């Protein structure tokens, strides 16, 4: 019952309402195997040699971390936690043969602040994975995604 009160009304209203139903961007060939991606006014480069940009799978890994981060920070703020530091260390193990998809992804959240408890962290991570993180729900179902955290209360 107490957990229900603590998470009652937790949603991403406002943030999720601004997400368009269709995203559009474009990718331009620059040279060799270097491409520039542009979406919503932002740009980044892809380069399989990792000299002028990153691999597409790198941005997939970071997209998952970004989606999780937005959910976790949004929910913790609604739970009246004060966040003073937040970082996610990410890693992914890929299949060795084509298609070289991620077999596992690991996210380690390092968070500091006030009123941040393991119970709150477990709850907000579960909400992100079960309902809100669109990147998580866009991944292959056989990818093992492990999320851990380290809390430093100040």
List the model feature ranges, each with a label.
Residues 1-62, 73-154:
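Extended beta-strand/beta-hairpin segments
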């Amino acid at each position: 019952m107490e957990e229900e009160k603590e998470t009652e009304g937790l949603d991403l209203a406002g943030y999720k309402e601004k997400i368009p139903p269709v995203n559009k961007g474009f990718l331009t060939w620059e040279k060799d195997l270097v491409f520039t991606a542009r979406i919503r006014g932002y740009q980044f480069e892809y380069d399989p040699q990792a000299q002028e940009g990153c691999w597409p799978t790198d941005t997939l890994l970071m997209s998952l971390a970004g989606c999780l981060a937005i959910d976790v920070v949004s929910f913790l703020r609604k739970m009246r936690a004060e966040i003073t530091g937040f970082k996610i260390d990410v890693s992914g193990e890929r299949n060795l043969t084509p298609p070289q998809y991620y077999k596992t992804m690991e996210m380690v959240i390092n968070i500091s602040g006030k009123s941040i408890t393991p119970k709150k962290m477990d709850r907000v991570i579960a909400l992100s994975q079960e309902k809100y993180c669109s990147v998580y729900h866009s991944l292959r179902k056989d990818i093992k995604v492990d999320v851990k955290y380290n809390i430093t209360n100040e």
